[in-house]
């Protein structure tokens, strides 16, 4: 089998750029995909819990309370600049 990799690139692939965060200001968070989004009170759709898809959910909160963000909103509040995902 031969794969034509450029054909697999989604639209805008070549325009995508990594955020420019100086290494001294980089804060890395390591998490398991399941642990990140498994809690039913975390505000994630049930079909996204424990899956990579949960990282696409914006504005999630604990129990619907706006003062307690979850997911990427929580990491942003902490100042996390990079996430290492564990399966």
State where each predicted segment sits.
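N-terminal structural segment of carbohydrate-active enzymes
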Residues: 1-87
């Amino acid at each position: 089998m031969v794969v034509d990799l450029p054909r697999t690139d989604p639209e805008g692939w070549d325009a995508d750029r990594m955020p420019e965060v100086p290494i001294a200001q980089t804060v890395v968070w390591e998490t398991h995909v399941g642990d990140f989004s498994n809690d039913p009170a975390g505000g994630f759709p049930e079909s996204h819990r424990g899956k990579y898809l949960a990282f696409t959910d914006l504005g999630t909160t604990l129990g619907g309370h706006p003062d307690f963000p979850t997911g990427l909103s929580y990491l942003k509040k902490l100042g996390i600049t990079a996430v290492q995902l564990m399966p």
